Amino acid sequence: MCALAWVAVAPSSVTAANRSVPVDPVQVARDYVQRHSQDLGLAPSDIAELAVSSVVSSRDNGVTHVYLQQRFAGIEVDGGIINVNVLKDGGVISAGNRFVANIAADAEDQAVGQTAVEAAYAAAEHLSLVPTEPFQILARSDGPDQATTLSSGGIATGPIEAKLLWLPTSDTVRLVWRLVIEEIGGEHWWNAFLDAGTGTFLGQDDMVAHDTRDAIAAGIARPDGGNDGNDDDDDRGDDGRKGAAYRVFPLPMESPSDGPRRLVRDPANRQASPFGWHDTDGVRGPEFTITRGNNVHAYTDVDANNVPDAGSSPDGGTQLRFDFPLDLRQPPAKYQPAAVTNLFYWNNIMHDVAYRYGFDESAGNFQVNNYGRGGVGNDDVRAEAQDGSGRNNANFGTPVDGFRPRMQMFEWRSSAPNPITVHAPSPIAGTYFGPMAGFGASLGTTGPITGTVVLVNDGVPPTSDGCQPFTVPAGSIPLIDRGLCLFVIKVKNAQNAGAATAIVANNVPGAPFAMGGVDQTILIPSVMISQADGSLFKANLPLTGTIADGTGGNPDRDSDLDSGVIAHEYTHGISNRLTGGPATVACLNNAEQMGEGWSDWFALALTARSSDRRTTPRGIGTYVIFQPPNGDGIRPTPYTTNMAVNPSTYASVADVAISQPHGIGYVWATMLWEMYWNLVDHHGFSRDIYKDWKAGGNNLAIQLVMDGMKFQPCRPGFVDGRNAILQADVALTGGKNACDIWRAFAKRGLGVDASQGSSNNRFDGVQNFNVPQSCLHDRDDDDDHDCDDDSAGGIGTLDDNDCDDDNGHEVAGTGATISAVTIRQVFVNGARIRETSPPR
């Protein structure tokens, strides 16, 4: 259906015809598409109405990224974007194509048979939203897309935007109404698609990315010996500078587990935030003395109405001193000013660091005032601390440039195991671990629940996963297997069956954990048990047992104090604005998209220290799940280049035990972490993250990952993302780091002959461990690289058992080979793809 192509050329082979004439990147991009339309598999009618949606210029490499939107009959094609990456001299280094080929044939005879109002009612019904007032038309255009603004109908936080789009499917294109609905509470920000002719609901995208533990394997939560937060009796940690002061867990600290807070002064970066963090008018002097400014407004939203709680933005006074007490032995409600201050600080840090590496005004960053530097303003982040709409979660909703994103940070319930007591049969009588879910009622509120445990059968294989409605005997406790659908779906089905509680059995080895998810209609408690305990229970059914509260009164933990979680969520905004350009946020809704991976990786990169090593285990979210800093975190394994600890490869993407999108992102972040360490080993580590990419391998890695998101096509897969980083290195350094990059990806199965298949399908990729032949003998510093760089993933020609892993243990060989291919051309849906090994 779509001509999915990545076209790459060596920069020396495509240059401007006349370098004395100023380069117009937009015209270069238009001309490129016209000249290469046949290579792209596109008919004249496919490109006849293309429009410029965004133009993003990158300072460090001089590349201008031009994003062209496909239209037909005056109506945009959803995700139909060609991105053309133009060098300073007018050369085209690469182009990514997501236009629909031969659209005229599929679009003919489709007509509008439903109004925007009718579509709104149909969308509400499908999304289980109940309008409390009629939908009214507030504005309507006379253009072909019939863009319409509707009243909220009581289901949205504000007006609902609707317009006609062409929606590509697997084999055709449909004329649809797209409605943008931000649900009250902010848990979901839907793009809903309904057939414009029939009103049939065709699908939805959620612009809110969630960081729940739902469908993720992790180690058991355990108490740590971290800081209790009593660090506010003096100015220890004061960095001595003048200006605004914030007592926080500063860069690169991750959480209270790393030690006491410090009072940092004047941390704003002068390039990114030239008038400080409390300015909005571009004139020296703050407009706000609260936790609000050009980049973010931080506050609490305990009542979950998406409006700041009264007085919840701490006031630093005329001196802008934000120094508030923190006692972690108390519940989060007792230290709100300290939590909001930390959230404000880290949102600004993310803004300023990302700005340094290219997420600036023209790229669609988040600012009220763009200070005349391009882009669309009035879109600072609304950072909501201790949001009351959920638990054990965090999220970030990203609209297009010019509309304010929303970050929601939640409290995390203690995951200390709740005792499940089995009374009978006697051979297995005893107490079992069962951490309570982060959604639904608390066992501390309901009290102990006793019943007969029965295995569910929902009638659809695998019948015990509870993903379909089921029935259970009155008074029983349903036992449900993990897998295939969200935890909240399983528990909601149990509630609908009349159960007072539910037990979910893990489907992978390891300890149980506190399940995450958001569904405020779930009113029963639920717990998880391990796979081993689940097998034991199932072998001894029916059994009787009691589930009771076992948290021991531990206070909840506040994700506002975990900078890794904050950085993860903020990066969702970065990746959504950079991929496909800031005028669209519909480019990371495909099955193989890597959004969760970039978010994990930035959390790792910003909290890395010079004492870290490539084999140092790094868990994500360890603080909020009551683990020590070296805990496994909320992913299947901690991040490390040690294959014995983190064995994920490209083939893992197709493993149904790996969740979508978090598990897929975990695989991508693992690959990026390999690249990060190859570059750090080669170029060293810079303690100053604001220095340019030449200062250290960590800075270089951030620059390449950020640039790669601009280079890659809309709706990328893993191969697209790898190629984009290679092209970014060509533009930045002439390809000098190509082999470090190739080795990283090839070690994890994304070598030169890896096949992505469709980026809309996570199951059709083929891994490969080959690198270009030019990368076999190019090392200048072989003594600085251990076997981790050239084995256990197929770097070089290896015999079995011929090298050691990161811990000095022998690694089984992989039979890897070296690819002699440096340039190869293949055809995908009629589009030629030229892959070039970057020059060295």
Regions found by a protein language model. Name each.
Residues 223-238, 777-817:
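Ser/Thr/Gly/Pro-rich low-complexity, disordered linker/stalk segments of secreted
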Residues 424-436, 797-798, 819-835:
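Short, solvent-exposed loop/edge segments of extracellular or virion-exposed proteins
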Residues 143-147, 289-292, 300, 333-336, ...:
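Zinc-dependent metallohydrolase catalytic domains
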Residues 184-348, 634-636:
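Secretory-pathway-linked proteins and extracytosolic
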Residues 415-555, 576:
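Structured lumen-facing ectodomains of secretory-pathway proteins
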Residues 12-229, 238-256, 324-328, 353-412:
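Segments that shape or occlude catalytic/ligand-binding pockets
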Residues 17-22, 71-73, 103-113, 166, ...:
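Second-shell loop/turn segments in exported
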Residues 1-9:
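Bacterial N-terminal signal peptides
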